[in-house]
Amino acid sequence: MTDRFTRLLGIQQPIIQAPMLGVSTPALAAAVSNAGGLGSIAITGSAAEKGRALIREVRGLTDKPFNVNLFCHRPGQADPARERAWLDYLKPLFAEFGAEPPVRLKNIYLSFLEDPTLLPMLLEERPAAVSFHFGAPPRDQVRALQAVGIRVLVCATTPEEAALVEAAGADAVVAQGIEAGGHRGVFEPERGDAAIGTLALVRLLAARGSLPVVAAGGIMDGRGIRAALELGASAVQMGTAFVLCPESSANAAYREALKGPRAARTALTVTMSGRSARGLPNRMFFDAAAPGVPPLPDYPFVYDATKALQTAALARGNHDFAAQWAGQGAALARELPAAELLRTLVEELRG
């Protein structure tokens, strides 16, 4: 299955660098791809032409395959009353930094489902792979991508979601376990999160489905890769492992947190963005989730408020509200150039 997947993507190693929005860069993606893995960029939040520019920037750094990731969430609905209540709740936190919360919240991350300019751009640019998070696009759009040679990967957190991915006609399913850093890829968060671990989910999907399975969540070294492959994965997707690479855009505070004692503990929060995500706990995890918290607005409207608070805090040199996403294996992160890290992972896998 590993050989089948690497041939499908045209890569040498069964390792995908996760498309971490806000952390992955064209330089990181290109370095991973040049070293034989599948580098990734995330273009959610970018207009189609900005996404096109990012794709071309990667292409200027590598002639190897790479992946472009988009969010495919159900579009959020504006709710002025709920948004006002949330902003009022956050007002004391803004006041600590001499700032006022925004007057209203914006939909800062359009879903692939609500931006009709993205599909034509992808069909023109033809990256080797396109991956989707939070849901699968309609089957006709998957077929359109495949018709021009693009491989389609979709994240799933349960066997039920994986069945929907298969029904959509995707080429592979990314099995995201509860250990994974960043946003949970749950399709319908209002139904709850099954919280299945990576290895259990990989085994379930490999045993029941026909698609190649990409293991994602908590995998940080070659032994972790080997364990996932032995359980039926065709490849792995690793995010936190690449955050400390010099090619990532993680800032100094994020890097120091990941290298320090805080990396020993990660937690899930919904107050950062409105959707469950795993990271290094800080005041946004706790102060914004204290007793009396009002019902949250939809994702990504919540994230707009958080980003405004982060900006106010950072202006005073405070990083206590930053999104420092990390998986449960964060303490194993290594500060290596991306190509060297990939070579090390391959050596560990084979050792």
UniProtKB/Swiss-Prot annotation:
Any Pfam family matching the protein: NMO
Enzyme class, first EC level, given as a word: oxidoreductase
Induction text: Expression is repressed by NmoR. Is cotranscribed with ddlA.
Catalytic activity from the UniProt record: 3 propionate 3-nitronate + 3 O2 + H2O = 3 3-oxopropanoate + 2 nitrate + nitrite + H2O2 + 3 H(+)
Cofactor: FMN
EC number(s) recorded for this UniProt protein: 1.13.12.-
Superkingdom in the source lineage: Bacteria
Keyword Secreted set for record: no
Annotated binding of FMN, by residue: 21, 69, 176, 181, 218, 237-240
Gene Ontology MF term list: nitronate monooxygenase activity; nucleotide binding
Manner of cofactor binding, per the entry note: Binds 1 FMN per subunit.
Record keyword rRNA processing present: no
Stored InterPro entries: Aldolase_TIM, NMO
Deletion phenotype: Deletion of this gene results in an increased sensitivity of the cells to P3N.
GO biological process, one term: response to toxic substance
Keywords: Detoxification, Flavoprotein, FMN, Monooxygenase, Nucleotide-binding, Oxidoreductase
Purpose of the protein: Nitronate monooxygenase that uses molecular oxygen to catalyze the oxidative denitrification of alkyl nitronates. The toxin propionate 3-nitronate (P3N) is the best substrate (and the presumed physiological substrate), but this enzyme is also active on other primary and secondary nitronates such as propyl-1-nitronate, ethylnitronate, pentyl-1-nitronate, butyl-1-nitronate and propyl-2-nitronate. Is likely involved in the degradation of P3N, that allows P.aeruginosa PAO1 to grow on 3-nitropropionate/P3N as the sole nitrogen source.
Family recorded in the similarity comment: Belongs to the nitronate monooxygenase family. NMO class I subfamily.
General remark: At physiological pH, 3-nitropropionate (3-NPA) exists in equilibrium with its conjugate base, propionate-3-nitronate (P3N). P3N is a potent irreversible inhibitor of the key enzyme succinate dehydrogenase in the Krebs cycle and electron transport chain. P3N has been shown to be a toxic metabolite to bacteria, plants, fungi, mammals or any organism that uses succinate dehydrogenase.
Name of the protein described by the UniProt record: Nitronate monooxygenase
Species of provenance: Pseudomonas aeruginosa (strain ATCC 15692 / DSM 22644 / CIP 104116 / JCM 14847 / LMG 12228 / 1C / PRS 101 / PAO1)
Primary gene name: nmoA
